[in-house]
């Protein structure tokens, strides 16, 4: 949303395509409408907007001759990967906003390490925005699962002190 707002404020024509799993998860619709010249809402299940994923109207618009100077994609890695797969054959510049785990903000911990253009980059200092054609999404998605067990444990764990009765 802040990117769309900033682009609109500088006079850029903004086409927004936002996607959600279902109607209950739709957020910031009014805010997007306020800064987009055109807004397309997609829901996986068709309960709101058009049924499908964001790449569907994106490809339709490109095939119909829409002349996008740039596509900016922000969201889940799998979605960004497929946005890039959609725009690349048409050579539409695509910027992805990567948001891996960032611990220290200096690149020292390596938690936000990515491969971009065959080189190691750190989202916290080199990004978070990168040329989508250069990002190794498969590696990024694999790295995103590294802490899955720890995260599950953190959600399920209980403090033993809370289990004791107060004397």
Question: Residue spans of the language-model regions?
Answer:
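Local cysteine-cluster metal-coordination motifs and their immediate loop/turn environment
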Residues: 1-2, 77-79, 99-129, 157-163
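FNR/FR-type flavoprotein reductase catalytic core
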Residues: 1-103
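Short secondary-structure transition/capping segments
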Residues: 14, 63-68, 94, 116-122, ...
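Short Fe-S-cluster ligation motifs
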Residues: 27, 34, 122-126, 130-167
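Short acidic, glycine/serine/threonine-rich loops at helix termini
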Residues: 84, 107, 135-136
